[in-house]
From Swiss-Prot:
Phenotypic consequence of gene deletion: Embryos have various defects including smaller heads and eyes.
One cellular component term from this protein's GO annotations in UniProt: nucleolus
Transmembrane segments: none
Region Disordered, residue ranges: 234-269
Keyword match RNA-binding: yes
Residue span, RRM domain: 45-123
Annotated source species: Danio rerio
Keyword annotations of the record: Developmental protein, Nucleus, RNA-binding
Protein name: MKI67 FHA domain-interacting nucleolar phosphoprotein
Biased composition (Acidic residues): 246-269
Role according to the record: Plays an essential role in early embryonic development.
Amino acid sequence: MTEGKSSDKPAKRLLALNPKEDAEFQKKVQQVKKRPQTGQTLSPGVLYVGHLPRGLFEPQLKSYFEQFGKVLRLRVSRSKKTGGSKGYGFVEFECDEVAKIVAETMNNYLMGERIIKCHVIPPEKVHEKLFVGSIAGFKKPKYPAVTRYNKTHTEDDVKKVGTKLLSKESKLRKRLAAKGIDYDFPGFAAQIPAKKAPSEANVSVCSEDVTPVCTPSLLERRKSLRVEDDDVDDEIVIKVKPLPENSDDVEESEEESAEEDEGEEEEAA
């Protein structure tokens, strides 16, 4: 508060050390005051900052770098698709000497488990549109194409899309025919389900309709269509005798079967 009040007061009159030379001294002071002020203008310096940790955006970066000097503009590079930070940005300081000091101090500085990379960009390499839109706040992308694609489509929308596709396909076929290209392909028309014939569509399936009656003529017609099985059984049945458990029984059974075969041969003779 005291500094502000003192600055508002007019500057005190300068006095010469020798009172006799005060008149000549005041003339020289007025001449110096009338001279045009040729103060040195500060040239801004642009600083590249890379390997930024997550969660460090424009407000945090500006508040951090303002401890070195006045920050004119700042920009964090973001993705147009997701809106997230790409991990690098640009800071413009009022004085290029301050930018050099910041680059020497912050280069290879560990911040948020990442090593920050900083270097000063030469003025001739700074693009004129580097900081365009840096003052305006970041706006999240709206994704109009994604919302339009994911919305629920009505039957009218599906019909409109189908008609557009068919019209494009017909124009393509005409262009191919005009160029003399004989090329046939199913196209979108094959994917659209065909409409039923009006005769089939008008057939009523109501339960109130009259059901057909089983008349004798209908029953006879059904009987004639049936295939009757043959009464004669031509199947061949082979009977196999069970084998006896003991070996003696096996020999006896073999002898009996041999005798039976001989008897059959004699009868046949």
